[in-house]
Amino acid sequence: GLPVCGETCVTGSCYTPGCTCSWPVCTRN
């Protein structure tokens, strides 16, 4: 959906459902 989840994943993990890590930010379809 939105390209950015408003979450960073510098540690390599995303906590927002449906988001994946595209370092250093979380993204989703």
Curated annotation (Swiss-Prot):
Keywords: Disulfide bond, Knottin, Plant defense
Record GO biological process: defense response
Tissue specificity of this protein: Expressed in leaves, petals, petioles, and runners but not in roots (at protein level).
Domain of life: Eukaryota
Processing and modification events after translation: This is a cyclic peptide.
Residues in coiled coil: none
Keyword set includes Disulfide bond: yes
Database matches in PROSITE patterns: CYCLOTIDE, CYCLOTIDE_MOEBIUS
UniProt function note: Probably participates in a plant defense mechanism.
Family of this protein: Belongs to the cyclotide family. Moebius subfamily.
Annotated protein name in UniProt: Cycloviolacin-O21
